[in-house]
Amino acid sequence: MASFSIGEAYGAGFGLVARKPFQVLTWGIVYSALNLLPVLLMFWLVGPDMIKAWGELIANAAANGDPEAGMESYTQTMSRVQSFQALGGLTSILATAIINAAIFRAMLRPSDGGFMHLKVGMDELWQGLIYLVAGILIAIFAVLVVLASVAIGGIVYFAGEAVGSPLGGWIKVLGLIATVIACFTTIVWICLRFSMAAPATFDTRTFQLFESWSLTKGHSLPLLALALLLGVTIIAIQGVLGVAFLGIFFSLGSIEALSPDSIEAFFAQAPDVWLGQAAPWIIGVGLIGSVLSGILHTILMAPFASVYAQITETPQSVA
């Protein structure tokens, strides 16, 4: 099986953003909208009760009243809020499946059509299924690896105890460090071995989770290097944008709003008042987040489509 170029794969996401900026923007909006649906539904159905319960709780605390007063109403309201978590999980899987399929379609099957390469069909169903099953399987593997690491770590610790100091102390410290590193490395390795499942499933239109193990054989180290590059890139982009956001926030003279007294006074207002004041910031951050989610998702996922295309010698789009 062919090898792949880390540089070519790493640049695939940036290249796709440059070639299809409006598509990437649309993907971000769709991704954010789908993830926002359960939140909007929750506020529509539970929002008034939640604001009322929250207001009563804050008012009681401000008046130095009984800490338990209002807690029952608040707890009941929050239990209703938690019922939307399952719906949020499903819409998150749906959003990820749709956007992943759009990215893979732009990379591997550009003539497949769809609005901005977006569709809802069997490709998206397969992506959702592979995402769900892979997540469950990796979680099971991770638990087993952690349990094995705990057992090995325990053996090393008691071996160090038996040897006694000072050598025993070194055995315990170095042994436990090595065990933690081995545990983390094994989990990362498992994730990398399954990293071709999504693009392979999209390309073949069949469930390719376990076939990914064969596709990634002999490519673990290059995949690790690629994953590290992508991780550092995502963190760097988020860090720069975070600093820029704080710079804008401070330049507008809003630094005083972060003082403890200002924060306490802000939330001491009626919930509908402070929500109204915060709404422009929430909307602004949401819009920026929509744009960024499409870009970051593309930068993260397109490289794996490129890796798949290179190792299977599948044509990939460059237009």
Predicted regions and their residues:
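Interfacial aromatic "cap" segments that immediately flank transmembrane helices
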Residues: 2-37, 115-142, 176, 189-238, ...
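Alpha-helical transmembrane segments in multi-pass membrane proteins
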Residues: 40, 44, 51-97
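Membrane-helix interface motif
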Residues: 40-63, 143-161, 241-260
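Selective recognition of hydrophobic, aromatic-rich stretches within alpha-helical transmembrane segments
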Residues: 41, 78-112, 167-205, 239, ...
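Short, highly charged, low-complexity non-transmembrane loops/tails of multi-pass membrane proteins
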Residues: 60, 258-259, 308-319
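Short, membrane-exposed interhelical loops at transmembrane-helix boundaries
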Residues: 69-76, 258-284
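Short, charge-rich, low-complexity alpha-helical interaction segments
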Residues: 131, 135-182
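Membrane-interface interhelical connector segments
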Residues: 160-169, 202, 206-210, 255-274
